């Protein structure tokens, strides 16, 4: 933790580059490597942690969940994803991903990733959509290849908070070091958002010290969504929340068991219930919730009786991804062959790699803001991306950035940006009804940073404010406490109370840079909460059980065979309904 200093002891570093990549996770690393290998453009990767162990792959994975085999085609994958999402997907985006997932898988293997093979040398698959790997080192492999690029600079431990723009073009971003008392102004001709989704909006399964034992990285706080929302970028399908079905307490993946040993979902009476409710992702969780509501819980994956060899495989598989599950089995003295594995749903997340919430982008991953691109979990419209889909989007965005810079479509050289460059700062979004803030200068962003060091002690600490936010979302916006159900009255209460917390967040006090980081993570989550609530109110149906369980409208409604999009404008989140995309229509063109 950095040494406590006075609010005036800050340095400002200004950086000029061709491409700024915000987020050094899966998509960000792959995009940086691609631009580095295939162009002369200078790239800066801004990462809040360290790219070697950051993002969703930090601890590793034991499978690549998007790999097409068994004679299936990319079109089959699109159909699978569309069916799972009840039709609310972008076919055009999904197809561009599905056409690349096998190619990027083979590229990962060339980089050194161990993909399991059978005696004939073929990949060991789980069904037709994924392959087994030894993936503990997958993120270090990606990071290593980024560092090999001579024209790529990685800045670790920097938190980006606000986009910078000139006129209608995004021209960089502002941020601060999470270790040293340093502020950053980064000027760029192109900016790629690759910050992942949003965790920590809702109260999690485990309390207290274990509250970060969750499915999605707790450090993915929705920063990429938030800075885009504040800047006026169009968002899509945020209401399509994701809830994961997980092993109880450890929050370890269940797919490894369900697909690896064919385990069925079982209630406390020994009845297999999954066929009763359906087997899409949300239906599996819906069935578990309904069985518990009916008094037939706890619920399990039926593993009792599997072979010792299969049990050993599960031990090893979880050591590659969620070692706490293996440790729990060992500590209890009973492995999965002796005892069924209890399951539960997590709190909801906003994540564009599993469901479809995120930036509204074209097929080349341009957002609606000129000069701004999106890839990975932060990009909307294309669920079921997983690791390889994020890599594919990183490459697609990288190719687009290179092509756009080659065309030099009106962008100035990075060293010639005007001094009167505008931004939207965190301070602009103080309540959902306020008037739209005007453009600000860099001093406004840095003033906001310094302001938190000058604040006196407030009623709530940052941690208490975060807990208040999670309690509000849990109880009024469809969290675990309400079995994921919500209604309009509750959403209105949530919106009002979250807006109050937004105001309070501006008064929070920081004693060091880590405190400042936590304050801005809270601010970003609050911004995402407000947008999420607006989307949930706008879809007046239950399109997806659990993911969007609207108690006022418990059935699907063909009227909502459309996308719910939004733009933050004139001080409020304005909802836009867009028709479903099958090709590349006029609705995709940038404003």
What are the functions of these language-model segments?
Residues 19-45:
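N-terminal Rossmann-like FAD-binding beta1-loop-alpha1 element of flavoenzymes
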Residues 110-161, 237-386, 391, 477-591:
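Mobile, glycine/GP-rich and aromatic-enriched active-site lid/loop segments adjacent to catalytic centers
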Residues 164-184, 191:
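Conserved beta-strand-loop-beta-strand element in the redox core of flavoprotein oxidoreductases
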Residues 15-17, 180-190, 368:
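Core beta-strand elements of the Rossmann-like FAD/NAD(P) dinucleotide-binding domain
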Residues 407-422, 426-512:
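Long, amphipathic alpha-helical stalk/connector segments used for oligomerization, subunit docking
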Residues 193-252, 387-400:
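Glycine-rich loop(s) and the adjacent beta-strand/alpha-helix scaffold that form part
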Residues 1-19, 37-40:
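Extreme N-terminal leader/targeting segments of oxidoreductases
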Residues 49-76, 255-257:
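Conserved N-terminal glycine-rich FAD pyrophosphate-binding loop of Rossmann-like flavoproteins
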């Amino acid at each position: 933790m950095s040494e406590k200093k006075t609010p005036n002891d800050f340095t400002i570093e200004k950086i000029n580059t061709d491409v700024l990549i915000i987020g050094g996770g899966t998509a960000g690393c792959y995009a940086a490597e691609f631009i580095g290998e295939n162009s002369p453009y200078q790239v800066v990767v801004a990462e809040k942690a360290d790219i070697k162990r950051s993002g969703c792959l930090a601890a590793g994975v034991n499978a690549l969940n998007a790999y097409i085999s068994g004679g299936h085609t990319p079109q089959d994958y699109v159909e699978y994803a569309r069916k799972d999402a009840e039709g609310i997907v972008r076919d055009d985006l999904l197809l561009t991903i599905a056409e690349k997932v096998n190619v990027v898988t083979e590229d990962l293997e060339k980089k050194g990733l161990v993909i399991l093979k059978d005696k004939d040398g073929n990949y060991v698959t789980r069904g037709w959509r994924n392959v087994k790997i030894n993936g503990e080192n997958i993120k270090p492999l990606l990071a290593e290849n980024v560092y090999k690029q001579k024209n790529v600079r990685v800045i670790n431990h920097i938190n980006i908070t606000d986009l910078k723009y000139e006129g209608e073009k995004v021209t960089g971003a502002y941020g601060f070091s999470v270790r040293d008392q340093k502020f950053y102004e980064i000027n760029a001709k192109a900016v790629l958002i690759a910050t992942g989704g949003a965790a920590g909006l809702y109260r999690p399964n485990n309390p207290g010290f274990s509250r970060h034992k969750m499915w999605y990285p707790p450090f993915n706080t929705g920063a990429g969504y938030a800075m885009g929302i504040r800047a006026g970028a169009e968002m899509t399908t945020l209401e399509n929340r994701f809830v994961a079905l997980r092993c109880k307490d450890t929050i370890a993946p269940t797919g490894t068991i369900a697909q690896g040993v064919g385990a069925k979902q079982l209630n406390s009476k020994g009845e297999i219930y999954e066929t009763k409710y359906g087997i899409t992702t949300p239906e599996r969780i819906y069935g578990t919730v309904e069985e518990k509501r009916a008094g037939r819980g706890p619920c399990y994956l039926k593993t009792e009786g599997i072979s010792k060899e299969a049990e050993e495989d599960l031990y090893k598989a979880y050591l590659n991804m969620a070692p706490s599950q293996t440790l729990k089995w060992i500590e209890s003295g009973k492995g999965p062959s002796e005892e069924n594995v209890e399951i539960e749903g997590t709190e909801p997340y906003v994540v564009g790699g599993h469901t479809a919430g995120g930036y509204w982008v074209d097929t080349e991953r341009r957002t609606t803001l000129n000069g701004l691109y999106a890839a990975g979990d932060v990009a909307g419209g294309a669920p079921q991306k997983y690791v390889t889909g994020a890599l594919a989007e990183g490459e697609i965005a990288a190719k687009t950035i290179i092509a756009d810079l080659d065309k030099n479509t009106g962008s100035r050289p990075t060293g010639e940006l005007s001094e009167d460059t505008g931004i939207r700062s965190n301070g602009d979004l103080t309540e959902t009804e306020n008037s739209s803030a005007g453009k600000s200068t860099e001093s406004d962003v840095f003033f906001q940073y310094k302001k938190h060091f000058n604040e006196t002690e407030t009623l709530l600490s940052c941690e208490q404010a975060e807990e208040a936010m999670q309690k509000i979302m849990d109880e009024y916006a469809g969290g675990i406490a309400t079995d994921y159900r919500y209604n309009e009255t509750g959403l209105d209460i949530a919106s009002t109370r979250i807006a109050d917390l937004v105001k309070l967040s501006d008064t929070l006090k920081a004693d060091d840079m880590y405190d400042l980081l936590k304050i801005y993570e809270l601010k970003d989550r609050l911004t995402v909460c407000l947008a999420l609530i607006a989307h949930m109110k706008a879809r007046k149906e239950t399109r997806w059980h659990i993911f969007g369980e609207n108690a006022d409208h418990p059935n699907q409604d063909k009227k909502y065979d459309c996308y719910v999009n939004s733009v933050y404008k004139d001080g409020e989140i304005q909802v836009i309904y867009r028709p479903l995309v099958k090709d590349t229509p006029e609705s995709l063109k940038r404003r």
